[in-house]
C-alpha cells in the first residue's frame, strides 16, 4: 500500500502515463471535433437541483471548453450511468452550456467505460464525417483513451489536462510524507495500468 502513497513511487507510476505533451493551438486547426470524456458524477448535489458532474469530469470540461472557445470546433460529450442515475453525458452538456457557454452538438450517454466511450462515439461521429478528433481527458488517462479511440477508427489529437504535476504531493501540508493527494494519484495510476493491461489482453 505504501507504494501508492509515496510521492517517489507515484512519480514512477505516472511517468509514462503522463508523457503526452500539451496540445499545441496549431493542431486544433486540423481537427473535425472535440470529444470530452466523462469521469464520474455526483449523485447528491442539491445546490444544483439533483445531480451534477464530479471534480474529475469538471476538470475535463473546463479544459474542453477552453479549447472549444479557441477553436470554434463542435463538441461531443461522452459518458453513461448506472440505471439509477442521470447519464454523465447529459450532465456534462448542462454544465458546458450553462456554466461555460459552450454549445454541445452531440451527446453520447450509453457508455460505461473507456472502450464504450470510443465505440459509441464512433457510432455518432464517423457517419457524420468526423474522423479527426481532439480528445480531452486526464493526462494519466490519455494513453488508454488514445488506444481505444484509434481502435474505434479515429485519428486522435490528444489534449491532456489535469496533470498530477509534482506526482500528487504538491498540495499536501508535508509534501515529503505520504498524503491524500499522493494516495489518490497512486490509486489513479494503478487503475490506469490495470486498465491498459486488460484492454490489450481483451482486444
What are these regions (language model features)?
Residues 2-3, 197:
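Hydrophobic residues within the alpha-helical transmembrane core of Major Facilitator Superfamily
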Residues 3-186:
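A structural signal for short, hydrophobic/glycine-enriched beta-strand patches
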Residues 12, 16-17, 186-203:
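A transmembrane-helix-recognition feature enriched in membrane-embedded lipid enzymes
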